[in-house]
Amino acid sequence: MGPEESIRIQSMLGSTIAMAFDECPPALSERDYIEPSVERTTRWLLRCMEELKRLRSLPDTLNKEQLLFGINQGGILGDIRIRHAEEISALDLDGYAVGGLAVGESHEEMYRILDLVLPHLPREKPSYLMGV
């Protein structure tokens, strides 16, 4: 499965919110794994945006008002998390999720990452803490 198929499936379900296709690296992954993973997630987000735009133009799309949420990733590496939050926030999505937490890191690490990331996501848009 890829980003386009993920968005098509969510569209066929008629869901109110579609979550962008992302990669959730294992909690304690090293920087040399997380950096390309986050870059891939951003590329996939752009592809999700294009596919949703295409689907909205089709006459038989169930929910032409479907919202798209981008997912912040970056493991427990604060600098990558902040950079990724800023990158996806610049795309003016319908909402934003923080993913890749509560997957093996300590509660303290999870809260530390949330404290770092949330100020870099738009306050006027919905936000969602995935999997918690």
State where each predicted segment sits.
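Non-catalytic, usually N-terminal nucleic-acid engagement modules in DNA/RNA processing proteins
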Residues: M1-T61
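Glycine-rich phosphate/ribose-binding loops and adjacent secondary-structure elements
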Residues: E39-T42, E51, L55-P59, N63-V132
